[in-house]
UniProtKB/Swiss-Prot annotation:
Residues 29-39 have a biased composition (Low complexity). The gene is CWC26. The keyword Cytoplasm applies. Residues 76-124 form a coiled coil. It comes from Yarrowia lipolytica (strain CLIB 122 / E 150) (Yeast). Belongs to the CWC26 family. Residues 9-20 have a biased composition (Basic residues). Residues 157-174 have a biased composition (Polar residues). InterPro entries: Bud13 (IPR018609), CWC26_splicing_factor (IPR051112). PANTHER family: BUD13 HOMOLOG. The lineage of its organism: Eukaryota, Fungi, Dikarya, Ascomycota, Saccharomycotina. GO terms for cellular component: cytoplasm; U2-type spliceosomal complex. It holds the Pfam family Bud13. This is Pre-mRNA-splicing factor CWC26. Residues 113-140 have a biased composition (Basic and acidic residues). Involved in pre-mRNA splicing.
Length: 221
């Protein structure tokens, strides 16, 4: 009827709004949240990726399989832990090697320095004039060519080792020297001096022997 009247009188037909029913529910009158639940989820889109030689798509969640030279499957986590353990053993061996080259005093000083650095992590940064520990450290510190050092109290000598014993020394035979100093425990036995000590000792013995001869000659006369 509307189309007939439009053709006859030239008026446009009224557009009727069509309503869709989704499972007996009016779309225009349904709440928005209810409309979203009624809509079907979109189909998953095919994603591009790597494919095998046979054309089969590779699942991106599959883990890469690693093999060694003989073809056995290896675990990456196990290999990382083994490499870390080897690195730690190497660092420990190098640290022991460096400690063996040092004397007992140097090792003790390094240990005390490390303990002091660890203790400083929990100490306060600010230092006041009445700080007892800092004042004792400053007072016990030896100062070169201090003219007033002899008037103060005697500073306690640091122990040579942690147990208070003597330092290790060379147990074999060694060339004599004028100060009678024994070589260290790490000495390889090679005399690398220029021969001055031997000449000096020989000259001292010769002078002493000549003095004895002169004394005997004086007594004979």
């Amino acid at each position: 009827m509307d189309e007939y009247l439009a053709k006859k009188y030239g008026s446009k037909p009224k557009k009727t709004k069509k309503r869709k029913l989704v499972e007996g529910l009016d779309v225009d009158t349904a709440p928005i949240t209810q409309r979203q639940t009624q809509q079907a989820p979109p189909p998953p889109r095919a994603k591009g990726g790597w494919k095998t030689l046979s054309g089969k798509a590779i699942d991106p969640v599959e883990e890469t399989v690693y093999r060694d030279a003989s073809g056995n499957i290896i675990s990456v986590d196990d290999q990382i832990s083994v490499l870390q353990q080897r690195q730690q053993e190497k660092e420990a061996a190098e640290r022991r090697k460096k400690e063996n080259l040092l004397g007992a005093v140097q090792v003790e000083e390094a240990r005390k320095r490390q303990a002091k650095e660890e203790a400083m992590k929990h100490t306060k940064v600010t230092v006041h004039a009445d700080d007892k520990e800092y004042n004792e450290e400053r007072q016990n510190r030896a100062i070169y060519a201090d003219p007033a050092a002899k008037f103060g109290k005697a500073t306690p000598k640091a122990s040579t080792t942690s147990s208070g014993g003597a330092l290790p020394s060379y147990t074999g035979s060694f060339p004599s020297n004028r100060f009678n100093i024994k070589p260290g425990c790490l000495w390889d036995g090679n005399d690398r001096s220029n021969g001055f000590e031997a000449k000096w000792l020989s000259r001292q013995e010769e002078m002493k022997r000549q003095a004895d001869v002169d004394y005997q000659n004086e007594m004979d006369f």
